[in-house]
């Protein structure tokens, strides 16, 4: 991320409108970034199935799992949730009401145009995917419209 460039879209209509968004300049939450350690999978299995089918915000999720573990978490959550749950794909547009999980061994980032990006850059603080990488990029894109949750 280049410090010289602004990651904040310019102008009143620069951000997509929709559920959870505010076109009047308010600080409405428009996305939720969620980070979890391996031990917090049980909490995710309780939290996400409790969301209603019409949950209006995108959920951007990083779970620290062992590098050699094949992740079936997205499939497991999808079978238990009323919202859509999927592994994030590179360059995928972020949609309301969808939970995106970082694929195993990839950093998950939010681009300024509200698309997802996957990176195989070096681990950050021994982790890939890294909660820090997701939170920093999502905060750059959403600003005060981002809520962050860390489960331990």
Language model regions located:
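Conserved acid/base catalytic micro-environments in cytosolic active-site loops
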Residues: 1-152
């Amino acid at each position: 991320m280049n410090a010289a460039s602004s990651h904040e879209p310019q102008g009143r209509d620069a951000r997509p409108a929709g559920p959870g968004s505010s076109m009047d300049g308010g600080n409405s939450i428009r996305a939720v970034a969620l980070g979890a350690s391996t031990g917090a999978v049980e909490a995710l299995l309780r939290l996400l199935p409790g969301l209603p089918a019409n949950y209006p915000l995108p959920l951007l999720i990083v779970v620290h799992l062992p590098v050699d573990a094949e992740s079936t978490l997205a499939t497991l959550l999808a079978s238990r949730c009323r919202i859509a749950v999927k592994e994030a794909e590179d360059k995928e547009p972020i949609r309301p009401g969808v939970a995106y999980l970082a694929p195993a061994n990839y950093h998950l980032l939010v681009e300024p145009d509200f698309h997802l990006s996957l990176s195989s850059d070096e681990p950050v603080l021994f982790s890939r995917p890294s909660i820090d990488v997701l939170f920093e990029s999502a905060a750059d894109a959403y600003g005060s419209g981002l809520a962050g949750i860390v489960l331990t």
